[in-house]
Amino acid sequence: MVPLVPREHMLRQFFHEVVSGCYPTYTGLDDSEVTTYIADLLTEFTASENLYRIRDASGKPLREIGEMLTASDPVLGSAPSFDAEREMRRHIGDFALFSTGMYPESMHMRRNPLDADFMEMVRTGKESYYIVSQFDLFEYKQEAPFFARLSEEFERCMYGLTKVREELDRLGAPKMLM
């Protein structure tokens, strides 16, 4: 994901403070790599072009997880390579984590009855991070264990995001980003 918000921007710093305060306290995850990743994810997902980054063949943003999964298939979908599949799966994991952690109620408001429910979204997020972790050669070797951790700790990370949302609500942040 190409950062749209500069590293030194106050919004990024704000999310880093909130996430690094909530995660160790409520989840027991005192892992700066995880909290940095989550805070950066929140920052970048404030831009809808990052939240709905996967596109169909005509360039239309895909908003449903099922459509994203189909697109990520390098044989049957629109992913032109296994590298593109990895990047799409990373995004699917990020999207699932964000959706289930920050906006679990959005799972009940889905317009398409064929789209994933809450538990399916959790399973898809974990599976997507696991698939990303299996790209463990060459340029991906160093970050593969991190995505394995995200897969294993998905529910704790999701719970941490619910606590982040509670903290944002307490501070008077806007209610809906999705």
Where are these regions (language model features)?
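Polar/charged low-complexity regulatory segments
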Residues: M1-L177
